[in-house]
Design a protein with these regions (language model features):
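Conserved, mostly hydrophobic/aromatic
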Residues: 16, 40, 47, 55, ...
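Beta/alpha (TIM)-barrel catalytic core signal, keyed to glycine-rich beta->alpha loops juxtaposed to Asp/Glu
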Residues: 23, 31, 141-216
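Short, acidic/polar
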Residues: 32-48, 111-128, 173-181
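Acidic (Asp/Glu)-rich catalytic clusters
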Residues: 8-10, 49, 76-93, 125-129, ...
Length: 216
């Protein structure tokens, strides 16, 4: 399978987005994930058998507000039960995200504070069963905290060793350039990824893709 550099690691160019196992929108409502669990782990195993080495998750991917982290637990179990060798498992990169909040009554919000980032990253590492996250990405910006402070908080997770690498999600082109200015390029040990929606139907972030190609 074609490989792609992601910071200091080579991963498959095709990854598996695991959100649907725990949560998927259907006319504004979340579908029952239990209906998918029976076939979900074998499906992940099939992808890993085919050479996929990138799994995407997030702390917020969960059936309900009081089960945050559901998807991370699932991903950890899928990798744990895979028949691959230790060497093969070590090549798998799990990318998770944080920064969106869900509280009682399905109240959604965002929190870009350092205290929240630290707690979120530690909780994700616990659920994934690792001492250090492969890749932690800032899910969405908090409108109540200035941009520079938020991205500096992202870099703290790497500086303190909670995450091997850090990235962002749902940043526009100008925000991405500012993040690179603050944290540096992948070759400088800074930002290594951005996860935005992009497809033949949604091409509004083409300029973001061009920035990624420029900075590697």
């Amino acid at each position: 399978m074609k490989q792609q550099r992601l910071g200091n690691k080579e991963v498959s160019a095709i990854g598996i987005g695991c959100m649907n196992v725990s949560w998927i929108w259907s006319n504004g409502a979340a579908l029952d994930p239990v209906q998918r669990l029976e076939s979900a782990i074998p499906a992940i195993h099939a992808g890993l058998d085919a050479g996929i080495t990138l799994l995407d998750t997030a702390d917020i991917y969960a059936p309900t507000w009081d089960d945050v982290g559901h998807n991370e637990v699932f991903v950890a179990e899928a990798l744990r039960t895979w028949s691959g060798t230790k060497e093969q498992k070590d090549k798998v990169l799990i990318a998770t995200k944080g920064g969106i909040t869900r509280s009682e009554g399905e109240v959604w919000g965002r929190n870009g504070s350092l205290d929240y980032f630290l707690r979120a990253a530690e909780a994700s590492a616990f659920r994934l069963g690792v001492e250090q996250l492969d890749l932690w990405q800032h899910h969405r910006l908090d409108p109540n905290i200035n941009f520079e402070t938020q991205f500096e908080n992202v870099m703290v997770l790497k500086d303190r060793g909670l995450a091997k690498q850090v990235g962002v999600s749902n940043y526009d082109a100008q925000q991405l350039l500012k993040a690179i200015e603050i944290g540096g390029t992948p070759d400088q040990g800074g930002l290594v990824s951005i996860q935005n929606e992009f497809s033949p139907r949604y091409r509004h972030d083409l300029n973001v893709l061009e920035i990624c190609e420029e900075y590697g």
